[in-house]
UniProtKB/Swiss-Prot annotation:
Binds 1 Mg(2+) ion per subunit. Pfam families: AMG1_II, AMG1_III, PGM_PMM_I, PGM_PMM_IV. Catalyzes the conversion of GlcNAc-6-P into GlcNAc-1-P during the synthesis of uridine diphosphate/UDP-GlcNAc, which is a biosynthetic precursor of chitin and also supplies the amino sugars for N-linked oligosaccharides of glycoproteins. Also has phosphoglucomutase activity. It comes from the Eukaryota. Present with 14700 molecules/cell in log phase SD medium. This is Phosphoacetylglucosamine mutase. InterPro entries: A-D-PHexomutase_a/b/a-I (IPR005844), A-D-PHexomutase_a/b/a-I/II/III (IPR016055), A-D-PHexomutase_C (IPR005843), A-D-PHexomutase_C_sf (IPR036900), A-D-PHexomutase_CS (IPR016066), AMG1_II (IPR049023), AMG1_III (IPR049022), PAGM (IPR016657). The gene is PCM1. It catalyses: N-acetyl-alpha-D-glucosamine 1-phosphate = N-acetyl-D-glucosamine 6-phosphate. Transmembrane segments: none annotated. Belongs to the phosphohexose mutase family. The lineage of its organism: Eukaryota, Fungi, Dikarya, Ascomycota, Saccharomycotina. Pathway: Nucleotide-sugar biosynthesis; UDP-N-acetyl-alpha-D-glucosamine biosynthesis; N-acetyl-alpha-D-glucosamine 1-phosphate from alpha-D-glucosamine 6-phosphate (route I): step 2/2. The modification Phosphoserine is found at S67. It comes from Saccharomyces cerevisiae (strain ATCC 204508 / S288c). Its EC number is 5.4.2.3.
Length: 557
């Protein structure tokens, strides 16, 4: 490969208009006002190519999205060949390259930093390997321009093959990146993966699960309402619903807040984050009947929350904790029926923000192991993948998935090959189908929704039945502005404070006063503030409980 640095210099000068801005790459990648992202897109495009070269030309994904953020924002993140998030050791490179492009006074200064990265990772630019990139974007108005900034150097300078998926959900980008590489590794002669592969696979798994139970009705409720946050989830979901293999009567499903063509409506008074935060129905939805089920996606359809309205018109949220416990209940039972409860390990992974009632229910009622990790999907995903054969994780905000180990797949295949037509076989087939219904690469609103619908139908549970498995403890999350958030240092997966010294002891004394009380403090990742979480048995005392903790935090800050 011959790198055309003269062309790269021209593209740098033409593209990198945003200068002297510090950029940070977090769990969500880069994310800020869209008007400030041209420079970041340019550098991220180069980094994605280098990542593919490092991995001998495997497909690397790049998604342009800002998820549940306001429509003025946008962002970008890189996806590994297996559909997982960018390797943690490469996150500093993303920042290094972006900030080099931002603060360099000329192209040569940027080129020096680029050369350092290439040398450090021992990437051979004289190779015959062709880098492969999969790109996708959400429905934001700024996305087409930012895509041009992203891909400007990929083919013209680095001779990369770029597969542009157009407008897709974030989980579709993850899935298609993974599938493209699996086909490449297996020597599959089929063309590169497409979104049609996505729809065919997940609808197929959904239908097979119902066929296994000989269930004709696909929904356990008379009607399902889906709020797609006026984001890319709307048109992509409608493609699924229009598929000839989708076997749910049209009158049973209604998609609302599906105006992805009106940029300023994105996430406005709708979507998963709005519903969870405000504990209310989204804009455009009024209670139709108390036996309907509702769900909301976020802007790029990688998270989902459910809810219903009871006969007294009271709103009930079924969040990520409720989703993980539903799946744990269902899959634990299937393992027992298949007599595999001692062979395969199932567990639920949570963060400190999980409601204490959900943790108690999983441990004491389901008798299922629970792990707690630091906040952030990469921590949850790693724990689920490394500690369990069936690792279930959902953040309370509705982002999550289930990871099935290689041992799980080997065991199920082996047991199915020798089992007879009995209860064992039904459970084994259920486990196999369910593992295919889940998008294991990342949280996926569409896939997770299908899995919830299938579980409720098989268990013959109504939304109220699901909700009544356990009752959430009253809880509150408040933001407390502090002069310097860096002094708040935690341990025990962010549940205890090390510093400021003595503050944790004061919090413990407050917690002890409230039955079933729990509280923790952690620094914000983006601003000089800390988040104070509190929960207790008595909702009338919750405000007082939280205020006491906040007072101690302010005094220590």
């Amino acid at each position: 490969m011959k790198v055309d640095y003269e062309q790269l210099c021209k593209l740098y000068d033409d593209t990198c208009r945003t200068k002297n801005v510090q950029f940070s790459y977090g769990t969500a990648g880069f994310r800020t006002l869209a008007k400030n992202l041209d420079t970041v897109m340019f550098s991220t495009g180069i980094l994605a190519v280098l990542r593919s070269l490092k991995l001998q030309g495997q497909y690397v994904g790049v998604m342009i999205t800002a998820s549940h953020n306001p429509y003025q924002d946008n962002g970008v993140k890189i996806v590994e060949p297996d559909g997982s998030m960018l390797l943690a050791t490469w996150e500093p490179y993303a920042m290094q390259l972006a900030n080099a492009a931002s603060f360099a006074t000329n192209f040569e200064e940027f080129r020096v930093e680029l050369a350092k990265l290439i040398e450090h990772e021992k990437i051979d630019l004289n190779t015959t390997v062709v880098p492969h990139i999969v790109v996708g974007r959400d429905s934001r108005e700024s996305s087409p321009y930012l895509l041009r900034c992203l891909t400007s150097s990929m083919a013209s300078v680095f001779h990369a093959q770029v597969l542009d998926l157009g407008c897709v959900t974030t989980p579709q980008l993850h899935y298609i990146t993974d599938l493209s590489n699996r086909r490449k590794l297996e020597g599959d002669t089929a063309p590169v993966a497409t979104e049609q592969d996505y729809y065919s696979f997940f609808i197929g798994a959904f239908n097979e699960l119902f066929a296994t139970y000989q269930l004709e009705k696909r929904l356990s409720v008379p009607k399902l309402f889906i709020d797609t946050a006026n984001g890319i989830g709307g048109p992509q979901l409608k493609k699924l619903l229009a598929s000839e293999d989708w076997d749910v009567p049209a009158e049973q499903v209604e998609v609302i807040n599906d105006r992805s063509d009106v940029p300023e409506l994105l996430n406005f008074e709708c979507g998963a984050d709005y519903v969870k935060t405000n504990q209310r129905l989204p804009k455009g939805l009024s209670p139709s009947s108390f036996d309907s089920l509702y769900c909301s996606f976020d802007g790029d359809a990688d998270r989902v929350v459910f809810y219903y309205v009871d006969s007294g018109s009271k709103f009930h949220l079924l969040d990520g904790d409720k989703i993980s416990t539903l799946f744990a209940k269902f899959l634990s039972k299937q393992l027992e029926l298949a007599h595999l409860e001692h062979s395969l390990k199932i567990g639920v992974v949570q963060t400190a923000y999980a409601n204490g009632s959900s943790t108690a229910y999983i441990k004491n009622t389901l008798h299922c192991p629970v792990s707690c990790t630091k906040t952030g999907v990469k921590h949850l995903h790693h724990e689920a993948a490394t500690q369990y054969d069936i690792g279930i994780y959902f953040e309370a905000n509705g982002h999550g998935t289930i990871i099935f180990s290689e041992k799980f797949h080997r065991t199920i295949k082996s047991e199915l090959s020798k089992s007879k037509l009995n209860g064992d076989t039904l459970a084994l087939r259920t486990l196999k189908c369910f593992s295919e219904l889940i998008n294991q690469t990342v949280g996926d609103a569409i896939s997770d929704m299908l899995a919830v619908l299938a579980t409720l139908a098989i268990l013959k549970m109504s939304p109220m039945d699901w909700d009544e498995e356990y009752t959430d403890l009253p809880n509150k999350l408040v933001k407390c502005i502090v002069p310097d958030r860096s002094i708040f240092q935690t341990t025990d997966q962010e549940r205890k404070l090390l510093n400021p010294v003595g503050l944790q002891d004061k919090i413990d004394l407050v917690v002890a006063k409230y039955p079933m009380g729990r509280s923790f403090v952690r620094a914000s990742g983006t601003e000089d503030a800390v988040r104070v979480y509190a929960e207790c048995k008595d909702s009338s005392k919750l405000g007082q409980f939280c205020d006491e903790v906040v007072e101690h935090v302010k005094a220590s800050a």
